[in-house]
Amino acid sequence: DVCSSDLSPFGIDPFEPVRHARVTELIGEQTDVPAYSFPTLKEGEAVPEQEGILVFDAGSLDDLASTGRALFRNGRPRLMAGCAGFAALLPDLMKMTERRTVTMPKLDHRLLVVCGSVNSITLRQLDVAEQNGFSRLRLTPRQKLDPGYWESENGKEALRGINEMLAANPRCIIETNDEGGNQPTADYAAARGLDLEGLRVGIASSIGHMLGKLFTSPALGTLLLTGGDTLLQCMNCVGIKELEPVCEMEKGVVLARFTYRGCTRYVITKSGGFGYEKLLLDLADRIAAK
């Protein structure tokens, strides 16, 4: 269905809602450099000569390819930005001829999904996974927002419970959403004087500390992290500075590896608001089949 982004689930994101359907309007909030919007460039069409930021619309891969060829006709553009679909066209546009086939490594068949996203698309994926056998744990407001919780006695007890869950079920979910909505967490944050940014950072940091405690657990298998904040805080909390992309397992779902305390681990990452309903099930099946 066609829907402008400001009216989509991305428009009601509590942390970073998309308020504009036009990229030029979004750019205008962040810079005084003039931005201009143009339709797709066709074969042989001249590139507009305006000074500033030129935004080209596209409704298909063919549109992206057509605009890309027009932009590259007279040499490589100095500076570009675009979506992942456009990035996939760059090797041909830049005449990068080398092709390598990457084989997905054998992964631990046990899968832990850690979700810090509030996007409705992801929540539906979690529901479908739970309905098909995933164990699902929702962190409490205290677990998400109390600094030092995972070092406390209650935190240590909770970690023992998580390890037991991981050992008992090869497919598990740990998420930060309250059942039926996130009002309990919002109330808990308000009582402690946390604004929206404090709430966001606090939750992501708590997930990072929790995973830091789990990284050495023999019950932990392959990790799947949803949401950029979740990934960033997890890496920061355990001191990991570098992720090496390995391959794309599905569209927009990337397998990467990192080294932690001399041990190589794999992590699957995806955007919170991305993917079809059965994505988690299909990924779990694919890992188990390798």
Label the predicted regions.
Residues 10-12, 16, 22-96:
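Functional cores that coordinate and move charged inorganic groups
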Residues 76-148:
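Acidic, glycine-rich loop-and-beta core segments that form the ion-binding/anion-interacting portion
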Residues 56-61, 83-85, 115-118, 176-178, ...:
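Structural motif
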Residues 220-279:
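Conserved, well-ordered active-site substructure
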Residues 162-226:
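C-terminal structural cap/anchor segments
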Residues 44-47, 66-71, 101, 154-166, ...:
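A short, acidic, amphipathic alpha-helical segment used as a generic capping/interface helix at domain edges
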Residues 2-4:
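Short, small-residue-biased leader/transition segments that mark boundaries at the very start
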Residues 51-55, 77-79, 110-112, 169-173, ...:
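Residue-level preference for the first positions of well-ordered beta-strands
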